[in-house]
Amino acid sequence: MDLGTAEGTRCTDPPAGKPAMAPKRKGGLKLNAICAKLSRQVVVEKRADAGSHTEGSPSQPRDQERSGPESGAARAPRSEEDKRRAVIEKWVNGEYSEEPAPTPVLGRIAREGLELPPEGVYMVQPQGCSDEEDHAEEPSKDGGALEEKDSDGAASKEDSGPSTRQASGEASSLRDYAASTMTEFLGMFGYDDQNTRDELARKISFEKLHAGSTPEAATSSMLPTSEDTLSKRARFSKYEEYIRKLKAGEQLSWPAPSTKTEERVGKEVVGTLPGLRLPSSTAHLETKATILPLPSHSSVQMQNLVARASKYDFFIQKLKTGENLRPQNGSTYKKPSKYDLENVKYLHLFKPGEGSPDMGGAIAFKTGKVGRPSKYDVRGIQKPGPAKVPPTPSLAPAPLASVPSAPSAPGPGPEPPASLSFNTPEYLKSTFSKTDSITTGTVSTVKNGLPTDKPAVTEDVNIYQKYIARFSGSQHCGHIHCAYQYREHYHCLDPECNYQRFTSKQDVIRHYNMHKKRDNSLQHGFMRFSPLDDCSVYYHGCHLNGKSTHYHCMQVGCNKVYTSTSDVMTHENFHKKNTQLINDGFQRFRATEDCGTADCQFYGQKTTHFHCRRPGCTFTFKNKCDIEKHKSYHIKDDAYAKDGFKKFYKYEECKYEGCVYSKATNHFHCIRAGCGFTFTSTSQMTSHKRKHERRHIRSSGALGLPPSLLGAKDTEHEESSNDDLVDFSALSSKNSSLSASPTSQQSSASLAAATAATEAGPSATKPPNSKISGLLPQGLPGSIPLALALSNSGLPTPTPYFPILAGRGSTSLPVGTPSLLGAVSSGSAASATPDTPTLVASGAGDSAPVAAASVPAPPASIMERISASKGLISPMMARLAAAALKPSATFDPGSGQQVTPARFPPAQVKPEPGESTGAPGPHEASQDRSLDLTVKEPSNESNGHAVPANSSLLSSLMNKMSQGNPGLGSLLNIKAEAEGSPAAEPSPFLGKAVKALVQEKLAEPWKVYLRRFGTKDFCDGQCDFLHKAHFHCVVEECGALFSTLDGAIKHANFHFRTEGGAAKGNTEAAFPASAAETKPPMAPSSPPVPPVTTATVSSLEGPAPSPASVPSTPTLLAWKQLASTIPQMPQIPASVPHLPASPLATTSLENAKPQVKPGFLQFQENDPCLATDCKYANKFHFHCLFGNCKYVCKTSGKAESHCLDHINPNNNLVNVRDQFAYYSLQCLCPNQHCEFRMRGHYHCLRTGCYFVTNITTKLPWHIKKHEKAERRAANGFKYFTKREECGRLGCKYNQVNSHFHCIREGCQFSFLLKHQMTSHARKHMRRMLGKNFDRVPPSQGPPGLMDAETDECMDYTGCSPGAMSSESSTMDRSCSSTPVGNESTAAGNTISMPTASGAKKRFWIIEDMSPFGKRRKTASSRKMLDEGMMLEGFRRFDLYEDCKDAACQFSLKVTHYHCTRENCGYKFCGRTHMYKHAQHHDRVDNLVLDDFKRFKASLSCHFADCPFSGTSTHFHCLRCRFRCTDSTKVTAHRKHHGKQDVISAAGFCQFSSSADCAVPDCKYKLKCSHFHCTFPGCRHTVVGMSQMDSHKRKHEKQERGEPAAEGPAPGPPISLDGSLSLGAEPGSLLFLQSAAAGLGLALGDAGDPGPPDAAAPGPREGAAAAAAAAGESSQEDEEEELELPEEEAEDDEDEDDDEDDDDEDDDEDDDDEDLRTDSEESLPEAAAEAAGAGARTPALAALAALGAPGPAPTAASSP
């Protein structure tokens, strides 16, 4: 094969006229060049031949480059010696051995690792000086001579003959020379032994000699193919075995990569020539970069291929095949190339059109396999993830292969962008140069032989050693023929510089600087060429080649060349920005660039704009600020897609055919196969997702349920809400939530009928295969889990329900069974009497199921069954299910019965299943429909498995009581569970004895904390109540004393809450208020927890009052739910005879009468005060009782607050200071930078808190902040100030606004406003507990409940019983405790809640959580929305109600709303939009005020000739005919009117430069804006408003009869400034006024453009009118952009959808921007305009500088 053609081609363009510089640039050998040239005579002789050599000399193309064009002497017959010398010289110069080394050698060299250059050191040489050329992309050499003829013209014909004749002799000459030189070389280094020499001959990289010089083989390209192959192979025959192989004619194998390369090149360049064989695989061993040959001008294809080739092509081959680049020889110093890429860490260099498709271009970042992108070329970026993006065509010209014209030709078309995800790291690192400039590190001057500004080198080393080696007089430099042996001299280490020798330090510095600048410019992505370098190899046709030092940009697709280093830095910055944009997934097209996308809205507009590069996204935009917004759009979109949904925005065309929401409102489609669910609220997303999860679980048999119980699969009742689904989680808040979409609604009446029939039939006849959902009556709320309705009557008794419980029949207890309790330990099934509605909390893993009403539960819980098949159900589902099934109370509206929480240790009561076939009792119907008002208690959870959480004193008391009196425990029907969630229901059959016992024992808990002293007991000589009945607190450091039992109980409650309740880790159960303690009080040192109040329910028989009943209002319920987090002392029931009724200590303490408050002594007015120096003596005040605290205050609020300062909710520290570290001069602060280091100060000890202060009084307040954060966290929220990093990916508020995050697992909601906490918490409650979780039940229960109800209501809400409406509970609902994921983790978003923490929370603090607390201004519209009330200005249309609006796309399809305000016409689904839209109208009203009117794009404004009517949202001025689409112009125009008013008031009229004032001889006419006085008879003209004032005062004086200081002459009046003023014609004033009116108050220069006015004077109709129209329309596009967010905002959130509040706020922010009302906004614009006009009118510029409102933007210059 003829492999040399291109060498000849390359040589057709030698650097003309620069023969002298060639030797310096000439490329030499690597290893053998250390031996130098054979003899200087050879070179001299060859130079002497120069005149006779032609350009095309095949055997010495390098020489002709070095020595200038040579004559044809090469063609003349030469003596044998000359031939031999020529061959040897060529070999020495590396002009042989194009053929690659065989694969075995490749492998060996890689293994031996001797002399390859280190990775990252790329040897590169410029065209015209290198020994090597890379032919990896040459055209095929099939017809060697033919191709050569093409490339070289006539010269090739003449050369081919001699070449042929020379070939055979060259091989033998070379072989002889090689053997002798090797022997001499090894002997020189002391290797005399022949075996050692042979071994070294193998190790020393002689193939590197051929590799380094491979391109020189091109010289033989003119030989016939057969001889060429032989001769060239002989050339690298240092290894005898290979020589033998070659002699025998054996073939050497080619490494694989070459084929790959040739294929690609063959396709791209000359795909029609199939025989292409490329020599490029030699590159795998080369140490210098091979260079694409420069083609002759006759070969267009070659030209295209070569013109912009990268110089580092062969390295790419090495890197792609995973080879290392190693040091090039064994010497101790490196020989980096002139282009040293060692430090160019981000550069891999590729031939254009070549390289892995995953690499970005000719120059690529060194980031694994990811290439540095070209300006527009990110081919398929390979993600780290499993999915690999297929390569996509480049946007840029396939740099040189595909564009026949200049390399700068525009790209052929847009590239389908590679997929980029924002949630993954950036794959393309913008690691541009850290170097400051191109000259960094160079040596500028020489002083005493040393550089003055030495680069920063720590050791005393030769700073030049990177490029230049110094040899002292005692060293041999290794260059055999160097004339300076054993004299001090220097050699350049770069073979491309031919190891140039220096003897002068100045020359060294100069040469070092050259290399340094080259390296620096590579760092910046530029190649530097000096006038001595030939850049045409890489950049063909450069006009600066050989003329001056210049820099070529190396980025693919960029053909910029600069001579100034500052331009280089600027241009680099441009690429940096582009790279950053590409990292972000966008592409920038500047005004001069063609984006190549015909359907781009900016195509052909010559404007800078951006394209999104993500697949399938065609978003284009002009404004850079849209980048972040669009990024977040994709982030959300990816998140939705991950969950199986696709969101379509209002402005998008929905891809689903027939969707009613398309182009109407933001909505979602489920994209799972076969599912057509459509919805508008993200709140429906989770429930629908769970629906699919449940189906999946069911279909995969995760629960192990027998098919008879599973019933129909997805095919039956496919779209009915979720009746056919096993709703284990009980989280579906409303039956309609899954079928709300208009496309999927379907009646479930048939199922309801079936269910009713099933229930009606006797249980015995129920078929064994009846489906589970058949057991669920339609009347049950969707939140009641299936387990509630599983009656054993629906199951065949002999067959156990769960396989894992085989052998245990499903049983229920008869009414008369002695073991009425039927309680079971954790994990076993609970069965109850049919008449006893039982509520069993069930948790994620190991708790009993809930049994609804009278339906006994099967012998194991579904949750337990799920737990048994761990891994098959997602932890999130398990957690949610657990949350939903943990009740705190349940209410039966039929009987008014309140079932309250109870806890019980699992080991206390053993299961006593009875034998019975009990049938449902008479109360089944009503109880089946009892509301499942359950709430999850935030116990400490870990991955869905609950850990015992807060327990109470009552639970421990109950525990002991039941140990002491098992019978009582049985009677109480306690359900045990390990989870620590309350669950119990007292039996209605409690005997009177039990009640008496309960009443007797209820008063006992105070004994834990207080000791009673009677009249005869001696307590303390100093006691104020000595010899009276009183109580002393026995808690350490408290010392409180009480004269009443009521105060004692209250104080005990205080300690119970502050000291943390039960011992940590105990699993204890709460119990009903009928419990009593049977053990003596415990020692004060380890007090148990006083009980949470839970009252017995009234019996089912009727409304007979119960001795201790609990009110059933939702208000109380909400508080009860909250109370599950915060155990309380019991409310002492009012009906317990011997105890005075007392409210809970959770209300404001001022309502209570006892003298001693918790931790405080309260003094009434005129009470003697204990402290002699008390400043509040004889006034109502409080004294702190803690330790030595001297705190005194006047209000209970401060007292309570002070209590918190003493008691830390997280541990039992008494003093707040214990939560801080104190440092002083004695104990120095470890933080060296602490501002208080030399003073006493405190550091907060909480993790992550860096609070420090030296003021003691700040400590309690700081702790309160932490407490507040913990309360928020308990409610599922975390607050971040704008100085804090919130750490949420993609959070748009991060370090921009103070904001909140919901920290419930899986919830990403973030918001700014406190009130959103309430609605969002309620959303989670609804998801858990059902839609009606806080509705008032239809009946308020037995009358006997009311006393307690009012009492507790007062206590919980602090309001009167009359305020018992649902509205009074809004405040409470905000506190409803909803599940927070992984509360046991102290790190991250959740704050750990230690066991005692709930107990320590005081209700008076919790009240502060209300978002409507002290700052609540009015009953906000949001609150009314929460109550389901309609806001003013809106109308609601139900699903089947005709709104009679022909343009309404929702009519008769979905429930929707219309805004009824004039000129609005907004229609939306989802009530929460109402709030946002109402706010929008508020903002609009504040903008338009009474002088403007706003018209939406969808409505006609009815103004004649208005161009915006029905097309754009726009504004009309009601004072003139001005209209605009940009809201910012409204304020500017208003200012304009204000200014005109000022001018008119001063008696002047303004004329713009474009308006003819029609005043004869006015020197300002049509020149600049000016003012004429309108006073009758006055002709004064001014150009500034300051002159008006003085002139106006003159007229005022005249009117008052005062003589003017200077009056005009009686003749033609001359104004003060000497200008001509108006004549005194009587009509002059009228004329001016009418002219001003006709000019629209001179809207030309000074104001905003007015409408075209037919009555205006000519000039106005001409230029000014056109300018006005231009000004108006120019803003139209921008305004549409601005207006979009507003409408998008209104549609972006749907019913009770707080996640979309997130989008909403974003959009509303934009909307606010759209409606900027701050007048300052338009001042800069006005001032700029004024300044612009100042060129014409100094006065106008001065006017802008004045305090008076500046002129509004002119029409002509409006953007």
Curated annotation (Swiss-Prot):
According to UniProt, the tissues expressing it are described as: Expressed in heart, lung, skeletal muscle, pancreas, testis, small intestine, and stomach, but it is not detectable in the adult brain.
Segments forming C2H2-type zinc fingers: 551-575, 610-634, 668-692, 1031-1055, 1300-1324, 1457-1481, 1515-1537, 1571-1595
The record gives the effect of mutating L38P as: Found in a patient with congenital heart defect; uncertain significance; severe decrease of positive regulation of transcription from TH promoter
Query: Superkingdom of the source?
Result: Eukaryota
Keyword DNA-binding in annotation: yes
What's a GO biological-process term for it?
regulation of neuron differentiation
Cross-link Glycyl lysine isopeptide (Lys-Gly) (interchain with G-Cter in SUMO2) lies at: K288, K975
Q: Which GO terms describe its cellular component?
A: chromatin; cytosol; intracellular membrane-bounded organelle; nucleoplasm; nucleus
- Locate the compositionally biased regions of type Pro residues: 387-396, 407-417, 1081-1091
Q: Where is the composition biased (Polar residues)?
A: 161-171
Q: What SMART domains does the annotation carry?
A: ZnF_C2H2
Output the InterPro entries linked to this UniProt entry.
Answer: CASZ1, Znf_C2H2_type
Phosphoserine, modified sites: S720, S721, S981
Where do Low complexity bias regions lie? Answer: 397-406, 699-712, 736-764, 1655-1673, 1724-1736
List the keywords (alphabetical).
Developmental protein, DNA-binding, Isopeptide bond, Metal-binding, Nucleus, Phosphoprotein, Repeat, Transcription, Transcription regulation, Ubl conjugation, Zinc, Zinc-finger
Which regions are flagged for Basic and acidic residues bias?
77-88, 137-160, 925-939
Return the Acidic residues bias intervals: 1674-1723
* Further remark: Endothelial cells depleted in CASZ1 by siRNAs display dramatic alterations in adhesion, morphology and sprouting; normal behavior can be rescued by restoration of EGFL7 expression. The defects are in part due to diminished RhoA expression and impaired focal adhesion localization.
General function of this protein: Transcriptional activator. Involved in vascular assembly and morphogenesis through direct transcriptional regulation of EGFL7.
Protein name (database record): Zinc finger protein castor homolog 1
**Organism, per UniProt?**
Homo sapiens
Its gene name is CASZ1
